Amino acid sequence: MQDLSPREYDAILRSDFGYFAQRCFCELNPQAAFAPNWHIEVIAAKLAAVRQGKIRRLIINLPPRHLKSLLASIAFPAWCLGHDPSAQILCVSYAQDLADKLARDCRSIMIRPWYRRLFLTRLAPHRHAVQEFITTRQGYRSPPRPAGC
């Protein structure tokens, strides 16, 4: 990827979720080296198939520290909203602190200059809730709403 022009690199990030996720990892963990592995490629391919509508249900079951959260709760919502600013994405977590961190990390990706160069998607300026953010096209990444009477 060293001989690519910036336009070519951007096109790859737009079209290949695996490379996009790797860029997200590097942005969020500048002190760590990304270690490519087959399981990351498989998850990235399955998530890309979800976005394309080829897979309707997907469970990712791996031990901790295998990039599940980065791939499925940070990079994937950002990539989907980049391609479809009206997409409606629910992100669920077992803990509030983790849910807040994942939402902040996803938002931080979406406001970076390189993301804004890749996609036309913009976050609505009037929404500043930690976990929920809305695009200017009414798409969102949000926790599920509790059901009530």
Would you name each region that the model predicts?
Residues 44-48, 70-82:
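Contiguous, well-ordered alpha-helical segments that form the cores/surfaces of helical PPI scaffolds
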Residues 66-72, 82-88, 93:
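Alpha-helix boundary/capping segments in eukaryotic regulatory proteins
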Residues 54-77:
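Walker A/P-loop
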Residues 50-56, 82-87:
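Short, solvent-exposed loop/edge-beta patches enriched in aromatic
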Residues 79-88, 111-115:
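Post-Walker A helix-loop "phosphate-sensing" segment adjacent to the P-loop in P-loop NTPases
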Residues 1-55:
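N-terminal accessory segments
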Residues 92-147:
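Conserved nucleotide-state-sensing and coupling region of NTP-binding domains
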Residues 57-59, 88-90, 140:
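Residue-level preference for the first positions of well-ordered beta-strands
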